[in-house]
């Protein structure tokens, strides 16, 4: 059976229209999705003390990361942090630690602390989104993350110590 040119054109147009309709229905709706800001959750307080004088250097409201999931997430996907806020990572054992800045948008000072609450090393001004390993110089049980540049500004050094308490509702 031979189709004339007009019929062929009509069939081609109909098939093209059906394909266009099919592919446009597969397209996702253009909705405005809002990014949910991860907010700081105060779960305790931490104080930093100078090694030589035992004088108070700074006080922080802390969010605590002590489950595997919390330690893995850390401050990832956060876009801001106040100077008096910090995250304290609590590990079940003392050993060499290493952190990196994957999916972390805030420059941080990463402070490694032993089981006697003494600072054993500091990685200053870790660059956002950088996946380079930032190891401790000595075994650590705790890791404190504060806003980048604060350890230099406040004179926080190896040998200084911390004291912290969890909030009662923890």
Which residue ranges define each predicted feature?
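Bacterial N-terminal signal peptides that target proteins for export
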Residues: 2-14
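Intrinsic disorder
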Residues: 16-18
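C-terminal motif of bacterial Sec signal peptides marking the signal peptidase cleavage site
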Residues: 21-25
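Compact, glycine-rich, soluble single-domain proteins
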Residues: 27-170
């Amino acid at each position: 059976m031979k189709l004339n040119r007009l019929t062929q054109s009509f069939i081609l147009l109909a098939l093209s229209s059906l394909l266009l309709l099919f592919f446009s229905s597969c397209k996702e709706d253009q909705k405005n999705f809002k990014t949910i800001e991860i907010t700081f959750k105060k779960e305790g307080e931490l104080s930093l003390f100078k090694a030589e004088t035992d004088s108070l250097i700074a006080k922080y409201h802390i969010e605590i990361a002590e489950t595997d999931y919390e330690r893995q997430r850390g401050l990832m996907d956060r876009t801001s942090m106040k100077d008096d806020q910090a995250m304290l990572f609590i590990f079940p054992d003392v050993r060499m630690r290493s952190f990196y800045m994957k999916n972390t948008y805030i420059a941080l000072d990463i402070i490694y602390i032993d089981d006697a609450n003494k600072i054993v090393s500091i990685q200053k001004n870790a660059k956002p989104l950088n996946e380079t390993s930032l190891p401790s110089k000595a075994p650590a049980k705790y890791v404190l993350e504060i806003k980048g540049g604060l350890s230099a500004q406040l004179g926080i050094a190896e040998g200084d110590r911390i004291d912290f308490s969890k909030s009662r509702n923890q």
